[in-house]
């Protein structure tokens, strides 16, 4: 009887792999129930799907087994097996970036399993296979004007959930959240900010981080149209939408609007619109743009931005620049009104504050 219990414990490799996948699928690292999705509305994350696919493929190719049949001895892997696996993936036509991702998935699995399988796992073997060189290919950028055109096109021409698709695009460009995070936003995640009269949206974004941003009361009232359209008291704001359906909708919209198919305009392109907007309307404050994008560093933020190099405001130019103030004294009231009607928000707010404090 004791031997049988020991055998069940020692040979539960599949259960331990499932534990790893569940760990990757957890919505919140903090375990805060305010931000956890109920099981009835949770989707299996793309992250988990990717890890699961990588793991199944590896053991099928290298060990010739399904993950449900694995025993501890199958966890032993040599550097030649890893090298041969990389070669196998290359011959299958996978790009280097995808191969690197798969190898990272495996190393993370083995790191998770090491504690319970010390006699079978040697993590150093993963260091014998070098990461393959990759060329970073960014998606194409878009603008607020173009994104709004796409949103309106979806509203007019899409047969299924046209209003929801339109508001999804508008939500994406305003919040700069990732698609997966937006699809998990619940009505209770949008709370009134009494100090401004606008609304705070809180989501679980990349890395299980709780992040927040604001939306205007005007746009929130637009979102409420979804409640009026659906009487089912749904918890999710964008109930029924999926990344796949949105990708297909965007593809159709690009075709209708004459956007070249070779242009890499994807759902993730919408994230950069809000980042660009904040940068331009904050007096080119890169840190404010970084906060809008919820990035750890400004280098990541700059990848999303469509700004061009402008040396006119560089220190090397402006330190020695003398500004002629005579046009300021010669300007008419109409000149000032015209200027401030087209000024960025930071400049306009500074001027209004100056006038009010006089």
From Swiss-Prot:
Keywords: Cell cycle, Cell division, Chromosome partition, DNA integration, DNA recombination, DNA-binding, Viral genome integration, Virus entry into host cell. Disruption phenotype: Little effect on the percentage of cells with partition defects and no change in sporulation frequency. However, yopP disruption strongly increases the extent of the partitioning defects seen in codV mutant strains (by about two-fold) and, to a lesser extent, those seen in ripX and dif mutant strains. GO terms for biological process: cell division; chromosome segregation; DNA recombination; establishment of integrated proviral latency; symbiont entry into host cell; viral genome integration into host DNA. Disulfide bonds: none annotated. Residues 23-114 form the Core-binding (CB) domain. It comes from the Bacteria. The active site is at 178, 206, 268, 295, 304 (o-(3'-phospho-dna)-tyrosine intermediate). GO terms for molecular function: DNA binding; site-specific recombinase activity. Probable recombinase that does not seem to have a role in chromosome dimer resolution per se but rather may have some facilitative role during chromosome partitioning in general. This is SPbeta prophage-derived probable integrase/recombinase YopP. The gene is yopP.
């Amino acid at each position: 009887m004791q031997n049988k219990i020991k055998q069940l414990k020692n040979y539960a490799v599949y259960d331990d792999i499932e534990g790893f996948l569940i760990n990757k699928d957890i919505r919140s690292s903090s375990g805060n129930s305010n931000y956890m999705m109920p099981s009835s509305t949770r989707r299996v994350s793309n992250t988990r799907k990717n890890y699961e696919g990588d793991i199944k493929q590896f053991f099928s190719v290298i060990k010739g087994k399904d993950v449900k049949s694995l025993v501890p001895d199958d966890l032993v892997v040599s550097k030649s097996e890893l090298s041969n696996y990389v070669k196998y993936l290359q011959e299958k036509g996978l790009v280097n970036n995808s191969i690197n991702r798969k190898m990272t998935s495996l190393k993370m699995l083995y790191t998770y399993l090491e504690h319970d399988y010390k006699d079978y796992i040697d993590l150093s073997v993963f260091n014998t296979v070098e990461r393959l060189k990759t060329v970073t290919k960014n998606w194409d950028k878009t603008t607020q004007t173009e994104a709004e055109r796409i949103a309106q096109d979806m509203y007019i021409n899409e047969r299924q959930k046209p209003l929801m698709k339109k508001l999804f695009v508008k939500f994406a460009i305003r919040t700069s959240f990732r698609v997966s995070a937006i699809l998990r936003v619940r009505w209770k995640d949008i709370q009134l900010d009494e100090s401004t009269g606008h609304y705070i949206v809180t989501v679980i974004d990349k890395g299980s981080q709780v992040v927040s941003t604001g939306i205007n009361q005007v746009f929130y009232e637009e979102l409420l149209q979804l409640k009026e359209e659906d009487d089912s008291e749904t918890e999710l704001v964008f109930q029924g939408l999926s990344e796949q359906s949105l990708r297909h909708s965007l593809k159709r919209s690009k075709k209708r609007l004459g956007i070249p198919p070779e242009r890499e305009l994807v759902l993730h392109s919408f994230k950069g619109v809000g980042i660009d907007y904040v940068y331009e309307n904050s007096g080119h404050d890169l840190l404010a743009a970084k906060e809008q994008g919820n990035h750890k560093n400004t280098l990541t933020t700059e990848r999303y931005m469509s700004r061009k190099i402008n040396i006119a405001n560089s220190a090397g130019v402006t330190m020695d620049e003398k500004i002629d103030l005579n046009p300021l004294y010669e300007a008419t009231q109409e000149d000032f009104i015209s200027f401030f009607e087209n000024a960025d928000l930071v400049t306009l707010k500074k001027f209004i504050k100056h006038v009010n404090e006089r």
